[in-house]
């Protein structure tokens, strides 16, 4: 396995560990999710370029679209929670309160 794949995989693991460690604040969780999506995007792009399979070139773009949607929804949720409660703790996101 080339070292670039190991580095990208380690970046994904570190972002996942950051998500598990800093899960109390919503902003930290969103940044870790973006790091995970970025490492997945690079990994899928490198794999598609190395495989020379024409149909696999659309997978990184689809992942990028989903990452942009996730970021937009996450930032909207962050603005809503910070305006309502004045802080960005994840514990304020109780979905049972409606």
Swiss-Prot record:
One of its GO terms (molecular function) is NADH dehydrogenase (ubiquinone) activity. It is found in: Mitochondrion inner membrane. GO terms for biological process: ATP synthesis coupled electron transport. GO terms for cellular component: mitochondrial inner membrane; respiratory chain complex I. The chain crosses the membrane at residues 1-21, 29-49, 61-81. It catalyses: a ubiquinone + NADH + 5 H(+)(in) = a ubiquinol + NAD(+) + 4 H(+)(out). Its EC number is 7.1.1.2. It holds the Pfam family Oxidored_q2. Signal peptide: none annotated. InterPro entries: NADH_UbQ_OxRdtase_chain4L/K, NUOK/Mnh_C1-like. It is a multi-pass membrane protein. Core subunit of the mitochondrial membrane respiratory chain NADH dehydrogenase (Complex I) which catalyzes electron transfer from NADH through the respiratory chain, using ubiquinone as an electron acceptor. Part of the enzyme membrane arm which is embedded in the lipid bilayer and involved in proton translocation. Core subunit of respiratory chain NADH dehydrogenase (Complex I) which is composed of 45 different subunits. Belongs to the complex I subunit 4L family. This is NADH-ubiquinone oxidoreductase chain 4L.
């Amino acid at each position: 396995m080339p070292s670039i794949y190991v580095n990208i995989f380690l970046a994904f693991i570190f972002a996942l560990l950051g998500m598990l460690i800093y899960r109390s604040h919503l902003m930290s969780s969103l940044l870790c999710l973006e790091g995970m999506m970025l490492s997945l995007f690079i990994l899928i792009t490198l794999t598609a370029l190395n495989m020379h399979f024409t149909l696999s070139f659309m997978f990184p773009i689809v992942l990028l679209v989903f990452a942009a949607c996730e970021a937009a929804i996450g930032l909207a949720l962050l603005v809503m929670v910070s305006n309502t409660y004045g802080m960005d703790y994840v514990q304020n996101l109780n979905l049972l309160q409606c």
